[in-house]
Curated annotation (Swiss-Prot):
Coiled coil: none annotated. Belongs to the Tus family. GO terms for cellular component: cytoplasm. The gene is tus. This is DNA replication terminus site-binding protein. Signal peptide: none annotated. SUPFAM superfamilies: Replication terminator protein (Tus). GO terms for molecular function: DNA binding. Trans-acting protein required for termination of DNA replication. Binds to DNA replication terminator sequences (terA to terF) to prevent the passage of replication forks. The termination efficiency will be affected by the affinity of this protein for the terminator sequence. One of its GO terms (biological process) is DNA replication termination. It is found in: Cytoplasm. It holds the Pfam family Ter. It comes from Klebsiella pneumoniae subsp. pneumoniae (strain ATCC 700721 / MGH 78578). Keywords: Cytoplasm, DNA replication, DNA-binding.
Length: 310
C-alpha cells in the first residue's frame, strides 16, 4: 500500500501542474497570435481503444479557433471534460501548432514555464510508475482513488515549444514496439502466468490454464538459442517535421498536442510556413524507407510473439 506521504506528493504535484497550466494559458493568451492550425481527430469510443485504424479523417481549425482549442487541450486532463461516449482509456490527440509573437524576454519566460511544467509532469509520472511500487494493473485503481477521472496519459504528456522555426510539416508515423527475447525469458513469463491461475473471458480458469500449458510446451520445444521477439504494432501517430533555417536542421517531433512556436524574429523568420495534416489511409501509406522484412512465424498471437528464422 502506498504511504500517506506518497499520496500527498501525488496530489500536490498534480495541483502544481494544474496551476502552472492555468498560468501558461493566460501567458500564451496575452501574446499576439501570428498563425494557428490544429487538426481535430475522431473521438475514440468506449471499448474501441485497441481497434486498428484503417482511416482517420481530419478536421482543420485555424486562427483564433485553433488557439482556443489548443489552450483547452493543454488542460484536458479529466474524463469529466469530455463526452460520455468517448473512451476514458485513450487520451485525446490534437496535432497542430500555434505561432505566437514574443520578445526575447517573453520567449525565455515562456520556455522556462514550459520546462517547469514538463518537469512536474515527469515527477508525477515517476510517483505513479516508480515510487508507488505498484504493478501496472494496480496503478489505475490507486491513481483514480485519489484523482477520480484522471486521464493519466494526458497528465504525463509534455508540451513541445519551438524557437523560431521556419517551416512546420505534419504527417503520420506507423511503428512497432519490438523486444528481443530468449526462449528462457519467454518460459519465465509463461511460468508466472501459470502460477497465478485466473479466468480470462471468454475462457474459464481451467480453459485458460490449459491454453497457457500448451503455449509453455510449444516454447519449451524450441531450441534454447531460438530467436524470439515481441513485435506489437503501435497505433498510428501524428508527427511534425520542423525545419530551422538558421541551423539548416530538421527535427521530427511526436505531435499529440499542438506545438507552441515562439517567434521572436531573432532568426529573420516572422511567421513559419505551416503545412496541413492530411487524412490517414492505411491502404495508401507511402514509406520513405521500408527495410526488407525479416522472415517471422507467429507463435503466440495474444503476446505478439514471433519466431525469427535463422
Amino acid at each position: 500500500m502506498a504511504s500517506y506521504d506518497l499520496v500527498e506528493r501525488l496530489n500536490n504535484t498534480f495541483r502544481q501542474i494544474e496551476l502552472e497550466l492555468q498560468a501558461l494559458q493566460q501567458a500564451l493568451s496575452d501574446c499576439r497570435l501570428l498563425a494557428g492550425r490544429v487538426f481535430e481527430l475522431p473521438a475514440i469510443g468506449k471499448d474501441a481503444e485497441h481497434d486498428p485504424l484503417a482511416t482517420i479523417p481530419v478536421v482543420q481549425h485555424i486562427g483564433k479557433t485553433a488557439l482556443a482549442r489548443a489552450l483547452r487541450h493543454y488542460s484536458h486532463l479529466f474524463i469529466q471534460q469530455q463526452s460520455e461516449n468517448r473512451s476514458s482509456k485513450a487520451a485525446v490527440r490534437l496535432p497542430g501548432a500555434i505561432c505566437l509573437q514574443v520578445t526575447a524576454a517573453e520567449q525565455q519566460d515562456l520556455l522556462a514555464r514550459i520546462q517547469h511544467i514538463n518537469a512536474l509532469k515527469a515527477t508525477f509520472e515517476k510517483i505513479v510508475t516508480v515510487d508507488s511500487g505498484l504493478p501496472p494493473t494496480a496503478r489505475f485503481e490507486w491513481v483514480h482513488r485519489h484523482l477520480p477521472g484522471l486521464i493519466t496519459l494526458s497528465a504525463y504528456r509534455t508540451l513541445t515549444p519551438l524557437v523560431d522555426p521556419s517551416t512546420i510539416r505534419f504527417g503520420w508515423a506507423n511503428k512497432h514496439v519490438i523486444k528481443n527475447l530468449t526462449r528462457d525469458q519467454v518460459l519465465m513469463m509463461l511460468e508466472k502466468s501459470l502460477q497465478a491461475p485466473r479466468a480470462v473471458p471468454p475462457w474459464t480458469r481451467e480453459q485458460w490454464q490449459s491454453k497457457l500449458e500448451r503455449e509453455y510446451q510449444d516454447i519449451a520445444a524450441l531450441p534454447q538459442r531460438a530467436r524470439l521477439k515481441i513485435k506489437r504494432p503501435v497505433k498510428v501517430q501524428p508527427i511534425a517535421r520542423v525545419w530551422y533555417a538558421g541551423e539548416q536542421k530538421q527535427v521530427q517531433y511526436a505531435c499529440p498536442s499542438p506545438l507552441i512556436a515562439l517567434m521572436s524574429g531573432s532568426r529573420e523568420v516572422s511567421v513559419p510556413d505551416i503545412g496541413e495534416l492530411l487524412n490517414y489511409d492505411a491502404d495508401n501509406v507511402q514509406y520513405r524507407y521500408k527495410p526488407e522484412a525479416q522472415s517471422l512465424r507467429l507463435l503466440i498471437p495474444r503476446l505478439h510473439l514471433w519466431l525469427a528464422s535463422e
